Structure formats: C-alpha cells, structure tokens
A protein has these predicted regions:
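Bacterial N-terminal signal peptides that target proteins for export
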Residues: 2-13
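Bacterial N-terminal signal peptides
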Residues: 12-22
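Protease-domain processing segments flanking chymotrypsin-fold serine proteases, especially trypsin-like
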Residues: 25-61, 275-279
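A conserved glycine-rich beta-strand in the N-terminal activation segment of trypsin-fold
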Residues: 30-31, 52-78, 103-105, 208, ...
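C-terminal cap/linker of serine protease catalytic domains
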Residues: 30-35, 90, 129-130, 156-160, ...
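Catalytic nucleophile loop of clan PA
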Residues: 68, 201-223
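Flexible, gly/ser-rich surface segments that form the specificity/activation loops bordering the active-site cleft
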Residues: 81, 132-194, 202-207, 224-234
Length: 279
C-alpha cells in the first residue's frame, strides 16, 4: 500500500508541470506574432519614378524610413529624409499588403521640425482601413538611458539603384545599446540639439528608422543617418565596446513635442492614445 501511495503522490505535480509547459508553448506564437508586427509598422519613404507600372511594379527612388504611430495613418521620420521634396514633388510610403506585393501610398507632409530633425507624415488613403499589413509602434514616455538595450528596425529595397514595388523590401535589425548623449547641430543656422549614440553604426537608408527599447518595445528615438563624429577622442570616451563610428538617434521627445503642437495622438506602451484628439 505504501508503494501505491508513493507512486500516485507525484501526479498533481506532474499535472502542474504539464500545464505550465503547455502555457509556455502556447505563448511562443504570440511572441513571434508581436515581433513580426514590428516590421509591419515601418515603411520605406520613396519617390515614384513611373506614371504607370511595369512587370515589376512601379520604379522608385528610396530615401529612408518612417513608421506608423497610430491608426489614423500618421507616421514619424527624420526631416532630412524629406529634403528632396522641399521644392516640390510627392513623397510616398511603400506599405505591405497581405498576399499581395507592397503598394505605394501618398504621404502628405504634415509638419517638419528641422532644428531637431523630425517630421510627421500621413499616408492616404489610410492603410489601417484597407487590406494592408500594417501596425503602429508605441512611443516611450521615458528617455533612453545609458546602457539600455535597443534595436533599430529598418527596411530597404533589394536593389537600391533599381528598386521596384513588386520586390518586397529587406529587413535590417541592428541590436546594441545606448552609449551616451551629445549635443550637435542637426541643421545649419539652428541651435544645437541632443542625440544619443548607439553602439552599432548606421548604414545607408536607415535614416528615420525607429529605435526601440528591447524591454518595452517602445520607440525611444529615430535613427539620425547624417550625424558624424567630430572627434575620435569622443569615441574613446563614449565606449570601449565598438571600434567603429557609433550610430546616433534623435530622442523621441522631440517628435512627441511636434505631435503635441499638431494635436496628433500617439500610443504609449499598453495604453490608449495620448495627447489631444487626432486631427
């Protein structure tokens, strides 16, 4: 009888182990789905070169990235990505679709802050109301801090010099950490602004890409592609981890300030939209 009791006693524990194991296994697909949704929020900023499509879709020029911040189709990017359109021309964003090639949507320039190199776009028609594969990213309410783990997420065409819409963009994920803050001029004849340095370098086409905190998956900054280090000594002071020139990002607080001035709402991590009602 004692042997029978000994053999049956562990069953509740076994059931609990199985239950937790099943729950853990069931959580994995959700995590993967969340991870995939990050890329769905990012769009290449482009200029359409053709009036009608070819067998490969529309031919376009690629300038950088933008990302959605709410369900109304508003996006953030860095202002210098839009320099080509200062004297005219219509920017577009390349938006993913389910079971179809990406589609070009017009991107209206809503507001630009050249001093802090941030800008707001709005895609029309609103891709969140159609059959598009889109998502939005929350904006962090706390600034990035030194040593914080981050990831920069960007898209670029497979062929930069011969890009067409029927070719799905390639995804780049650059992981690293925040090194330090510096003050620099982001535009001629304007006051200095803050940027924070990244432990990884920035490559061509990453301008305007979101920099997300790994823990919250909220945007803490935008990749600043034209920033250059002025002193090799400063590199050594910033970190001994990376021998290459570090990348830089515009703090998200500058973009949030521009959104507030335009009364445009955004999302914070696991919260309803912030600020005033969306225009």
């Amino acid at each position: 009888m004692r042997q029978n009791k000994a053999s049956t006693a562990p069953w509740p524990a076994v059931l609990l182990v199985c239950l937790f194991g099943c729950l853990a296994a069931g959580a994995a697909p959700d995590d993967l789905a969340d991870d995939a949704s990050l890329a769905a929020a990012v769009c290449p900023v482009v200029y359409q070169l053709d009036q009608s499509p070819s067998s490969r879709g529309y031919h376009y020029s690629f300038f950088g990235n933008a990302f959605f911040i709410n369900e109304q189709g508003y996006l953030l990017t860095v202002a210098h990505v839009l320099e080509t359109f200062r004297d005219g021309g219509q920017p577009y964003v390349l938006v993913s679709r389910r079971n179809s090639p990406p589609r070009l949507l017009q991107a209206a320039i809503i507001a630009v802050d050249p001093e802090h190199d941030v800008a707001i776009l709005r895609a029309t028609p609103n891709p969140f109301e159609g059959k598009h594969k889109v998502a939005f990213l929350p904006l962090a309410h706390e600034p990035a801090i030194r040593g914080q783990a981050v990831i920069a997420l960007s898209l670029h065409p497979p062929k930069l010099q011969n890009a067409h819409t029927f070719q799905a963009p390639q995804e780049d994920r650059s992981s690293g950490e925040v090194l330090s803050y510096e003050s620099t001029q982001l535009e001629k004849s304007v006051p200095s602004a803050d940027v924070f340095l990244l432990s990884h370098s920035v490559t061509r086409g990453q301008s305007g890409s979101p920099v997300l905190a790994l823990d919250s998956r909220a945007v803490v900054g935008l990749v600043e592609g034209r920033w250059l280090r002025s002193s090799a000594v400063s590199i050594a002071k910033s970190s001994s981890l990376s021998p290459s020139i570090p990348g830089a990002a515009v703090p998200i607080r500058y973009a949030i300030a521009l959104l507030q001035r335009q009364s445009i709402s955004w999302h914070t991590p696991q919260s309803p939209p912030s600020s005033s009602p969306t225009r």
